[in-house]
């Protein structure tokens, strides 16, 4: 989904979303970046990024069937207003939302949010607990290490059901957390996909240890997809169209249940002329469509 850089205009969002739905794609995904610290080497993608949830609300209004996901919003936000936003988005999209959560990794964003990054793991677990309470309990009341809620009603609840929660992260503790607490796991843009099967296995193992059904979990891969005309040494999902199609099949064999192609992480797209970037995206949508 056009979300970063000059190509991320409402017109491009509409063009990509409606074409993806016509071509039989199953999901549209967004991501979050609140700040780009001056001098930070994180790359051009993060320099200019639209809000992920407002973008999804726009997409919900111009599509009918395709699912909507965020990978990820970070748990340095406050869970009560986020729970309300996600519940509303789930309802207005008629149940099409998937909520991916991360812990965050940019110190300046933690500082701006007034959150201590040293305790982000425990905070993230309590964050998930609060979200689910907000979506399910008739009366919400919470006294935790990080959050407090006096007895309150939190209505309306998300309809037709609460959105599934995916957790990100690649460290062992993060993968085990996803298996214990979440409805699945989502990989990051920096993921070394050669090791994704082992990470999926670890999430499943943690789910089993927690008495949960690992077969019910989703494993979502953010595909940093970069089409390049000539074959050669490369990372997964970078290369010719044929190589990328082979990689898609290989990822399914590794246990990936959902793959989305994220062109925002291709420097040839985010730094290109917006019209040229959109043309490239539309060609790729056609070439990699599920029925292609």
What are the language-model segments listed below?
Residues 1, 28-30, 68-70, 97-101, ...:
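Hydrophobic faces of well-ordered beta-strands that scaffold small-molecule active sites
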Residues 1-62, 163, 264, 270-287:
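N-terminal beta1-alpha1-beta2 module of alpha/beta enzyme domains
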Residues 21-22, 26, 118-158, 188-292:
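An alpha-helical appendage that flanks or caps ligand/catalytic pockets
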Residues 36-43, 75-181, 196-210, 215:
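Internal, glycine-rich beta/alpha segment that forms the wall or movable "lid"
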């Amino acid at each position: 989904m056009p979300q970063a850089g000059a190509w991320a205009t409402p017109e491009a969002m509409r063009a990509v979303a409606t074409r993806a739905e016509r071509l039989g794609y199953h999901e549209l995904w967004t991501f979050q970046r609140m700040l780009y610290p001056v001098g930070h080497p994180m790359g051009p993608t993060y320099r200019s990024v639209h809000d992920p949830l407002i973008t999804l609300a726009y997409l919900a209004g111009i599509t009918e069937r395709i699912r909507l996901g965020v990978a990820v919003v970070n748990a340095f936000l406050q869970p009560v207003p986020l729970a309300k936003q996600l519940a509303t988005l789930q309802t207005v999209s008629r149940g099409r939302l998937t909520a991916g959560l991360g812990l965050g990794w940019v110190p300046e964003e933690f500082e701006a949010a007034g959150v201590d990054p040293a305790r982000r793991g425990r905070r993230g677990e309590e964050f998930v607990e609060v979200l689910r309470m907000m979506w399910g309990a008739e009366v919400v009341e919470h006294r935790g290490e990080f959050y407090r809620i006096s007895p309150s009603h939190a209505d309306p609840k998300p309809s037709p059901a609460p959105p599934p929660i995916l957790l990100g992260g690649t460290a062992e503790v993060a993968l085990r957390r996803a298996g214990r607490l979440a409805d699945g796991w989502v990989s990051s843009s920096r993921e070394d996909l050669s090791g994704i099967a082992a990470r999926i296995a670890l999430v499943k193992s943690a789910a089993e240890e927690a008495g949960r059904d690992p077969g019910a979990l989703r494993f979502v891969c953010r595909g940093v997809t970069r089409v390049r005309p000539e074959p050669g040494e490369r990372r997964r999902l970078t290369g010719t169209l044929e190589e990328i199609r082979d990689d898609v099949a290989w990822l399914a064999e590794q246990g990936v249940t959902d793959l989305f192609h994220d062109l925002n992480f291709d420097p040839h797209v985010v730094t290109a002329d917006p019209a040229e970037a959109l043309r490239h995206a539309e060609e790729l949508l056609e070439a990699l469509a599920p029925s292609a």
